[in-house]
């Protein structure tokens, strides 16, 4: 049995919230930049060029690629031989989202109750999908879901 302190989950989720809003995977960035050079439609070329400029600006200024940083959707694979210590696992994820969105200066746009429309001001709660898998590892993937998607 492997023990994992939930503070490590909080730290990892915080960092992933910030990074996933600022940096695209290298293969996706490369594909977009290649498309900029080969696109023949003027509108398509303009959109792709905007995306490339946004990626460059995000990297240089440490800001989000897009102003819509969305709602954090967290996919977790937890090994059946993992035992969390130091607190509640789901609360650790929500705290990581809270810290990542606030400290990363990401747009806070989640409401606590859809009828009251009151902003939580920290982008919680996150949507959490958890799978139990064999082993003693924990894998986290944070996917910000923009509200236009």
Regions found by a protein language model. Name each.
Residues 1-149:
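Non-transmembrane, aqueous-exposed alpha-helical and coiled segments at domain scale
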